[in-house]
Regions:
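Bacterial N-terminal signal peptides that target proteins for export
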Residues: 1-10
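N-terminal signal peptide c-region/cleavage motif recognized by signal peptidases
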Residues: 17-20
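Periplasmic polypeptide-binding modules associated with outer-membrane biogenesis and secretion
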Residues: 23-36, 46-280, 289, 303-321, ...
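Flexible, surface-exposed loop regions and adjacent strand-edge segments
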Residues: 116, 200-204, 280, 349-354, ...
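Gram-negative/organellar outer-membrane beta-barrel architecture
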Residues: 119-124, 223-414, 441, 478-482, ...
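Short, contiguous acidic/charged loop-to-helix segments that flank catalytic cores in large enzymes
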Residues: 218, 273-279, 305-307, 425-428, ...
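C-terminal outer-membrane beta-barrel translocator/porin domains of Gram-negative envelope proteins
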Residues: 236, 377-385, 389-514, 522-526, ...
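C-terminal structured "cap/appendage" subdomains that terminate the fold
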Residues: 527, 531, 535-555, 559, ...
């Protein structure tokens, strides 16, 4: 084994000579070890504090015991340890305690006997654990691996319901003279417990709705993962402020069938949330939301929200009706809204009604059939009109993330098709296709990439009567930074924005975590909003920014400028709060 010289500068020891003489500084120097052996010895020595250090033989004995213990855990039982006390230099009163360690020959695995009894013999989780954890003959003994292997049996027992499991034998035999070690384990899992009836207590919701949320059946094999999923599904409804589902061992010990006691606390019937924010796109804004998470014992819920900013004011109402067959994944959503907009060259007053039928599958994809009605009175540029639309649509979307409010991994995808036709009473015919994607990936912990893409297409026989809310405008945050909010679109003869029938934008952003919750960012945004794809008008912006992963969500500040556009020479600043997905 290569002999490396390691100075532990972090351990400074004060040896008191006499009250009249200043204590000398002692530096501990460790030689002869490397890699995992060196790290484990250092970890053991870290428990010795400076005020416990002594220059006598008792300290050396304690040091020797610590080193031997650290090495034996990794299969080295016969180290040779020598000590030398040397002056650090001729000009100082400081000393160096030089500890030289020869780990000696290792003890290697000579054989393993692993016996598994009980119903766990047929459990693939146990079979996989044994296959993964059984050491190969001839490898150096690691007592930590042995302990972890044993603990894995107990962990699997709790997870898979072998609550009577126990080791009939668990021996780690070591022959130091022969340099051999033997694993000898005999584990009897006993009988696997099964799920009994789920008993709900304290619920204000009809029990048939709750039973549709249970992810297992009575008589199924017990799994703590399934029990956790029951807790998650009940919590996800929003009906309860507290959910505690746990097995009742007092009633299932003899039969090996565990009733599940589920104690529920109803959510507060009315909640009000208010918020004040600022974004560069719309300036300061205020939002207030009143929610009733449950209106009746069928689990129906409703909410009212209002949003106020200088360019946009909006009032929305929604009413959710969960379906008995699958209350969490399938439901109807009824919506109504009023909106007023005065932004750039757009002025509009909009009334909307909508009914949607939602499905969500186990992979996270949410599908919806929508039927929308809207009445818009608007002025866009120099055109003033009123349009009534009745249009069905289909949408699918999915959002995934890992890593909290500042995800290290995630993506958001949304695709939709909306169709209007004069056949059923709409003022105009159109087909609108849209796709939005955001992807977040992190490399080597500190390097984070955010990719965005948006595509939209309107096919219509009368574009001037398409309401501004349905037209495409680019520019601003989450679009093309370097341009003002919704300031990129075709213009009319008076140089006023008209909105576009085609849009495509993309963004590449790199973020670096330079300290704690702070990230620096550089980005490039590009895209266009046009009526004729043969006449491209690509706009590009680039810039830098900073991100703070605050307790209430990511807060960002970006500075960007347009590239190669003689009409856009100034800097644009963007301030935002909220999730990236």
């Amino acid at each position: 084994m290569p002999r490396l010289r390691l100075s532990l500068y972090g351990m400074t020891l004060m040896l008191l000579a006499t009250p009249a003489i200043q204590a000398a500084t002692v530096r501990l120097q460790l030689e002869g070890l490397s890699g995992e052996l060196q790290n484990n010895v250092r970890l053991g020595l870290a428990s010795i504090s400076s005020d416990e250090v002594s220059a006598d033989s008792r300290f050396q004995a304690r040091l020797t015991d610590s080193i031997k213990k650290s090495l034996s855990a990794l299969g080295y039982f016969q180290p040779a340890i020598t000590f030398q006390t040397l002056p650090e230099s001729l000009t100082t009163n400081n000393n160096v305690i030089k500890v030289t360690v020869d780990p000696g020959p290792p003890v290697k695995i000579a054989g393993t006997t692993i016996v598994l009894e009980g119903e766990a013999r047929q459990d693939p989780d146990y079979q996989a654990w044994i296959k993964k954890g059984r050491p190969k003959t001839g490898t150096v003994l690691n007592q930590g691996d042995y302990d972890s292997f044993k603990n894995g049996f107990s962990s699997l027992a709790l997870r898979n319901g072998y609550f009577d499991g126990e080791f009939k034998k668990s021996q780690l035999g070591v022959s130091v003279d022969r340099g051999e070690a033997f694993w000898d384990l005999d584990y009897d899992s006993g009988q696997r417990y099964r799920f009994g009836d789920v008993i709900f207590q304290g619920s204000q919701i009809r029990e048939e709705y709750l039973r549709r949320l249970i992810p297992f059946h009575q008589g199924d094999k017990y799994s703590s993962l399934d029990l956790a999923e029951l807790n998650r599904r009940l919590s996800a409804t929003g009906w309860f402020s507290s959910v505690v589902a746990s097995p009742d061992f007092s009633k299932g010990k003899a039969s090996k069938v565990l009733p599940i006691s589920t104690v529920l606390t109803p959510a507060v019937k009315n909640t009000v949330e208010t918020g004040v924010g600022y974004s560069t796109d719309v300036g300061p804004h205020v939002k207030a939301t009143w929610k009733r998470p449950w209106v009746n014992d069928n689990g129906q819920s409703m909410s009212f929200s209002t949003y106020l900013s200088q360019p946009e004011q909006q009032l929305d109402m929604s009413y959710k009706v969960p379906l008995l067959k699958s209350p969490l994944e399938q439901y109807y959503l009824f919506q109504a809204g009023l909106k007023r907009t005065d932004l750039n060259d757009t002025k509009s007053d909009t009334s909307t009604l909508a009914v949607s039928r939602y499905w969500e599958n186990s992979s996270g994809w949410q599908k919806a059939l929508n039927l929308r009605w809207r009445l818009d009175h608007y002025t866009q540029g120099t055109v003033t009109d009123t349009t009534m639309l009745l249009y069905p649509g289909v949408s699918v979307n999915r959002t995934r993330s890992r890593g909290g409010m500042m995800p290290t991994w995630g993506d958001s995808q949304r695709y939709s098709v909306d169709v209007s036709d004069t056949t059923w009473g709409s003022d105009i015919d159109f087909v609108i296709l849209q796709a939005q994607n955001v992807w977040i990936r992190t490399l080597a912990e500190r390097h984070r990439f955010v990719l965005r893409g948006n595509v939209g297409w309107i096919e219509t026989n009368d574009f001037d009567r398409v309401p501004p809310d349905l037209r495409f405008f680019a520019g601003g945050d989450r679009s093309i930074r370097g341009y003002k909010y919704k300031d990129v679109s075709p213009r009319d003869s008076d140089d006023k924005l008209t909105g576009a029938s085609k849009m495509a934008t993309g963004s590449v952003e790199y973020q670096y975590n330079f300290t704690g919750n702070w990230w620096g960012a550089v980005f490039l945004d590009s895209g266009e909003a046009v009526n004729d794809i043969k006449q491209t008008d690509i706009k590009t912006g680039t810039g830098v920014g900073i991100r703070w992963a605050s307790p209430v969500g990511p807060i960002k500040l970006d500075i960007a400028r347009a590239v190669g556009d003689k009409d856009e020479r100034g800097l644009q600043f963007y301030i935002g709060l909220g999730p990236e997905l």
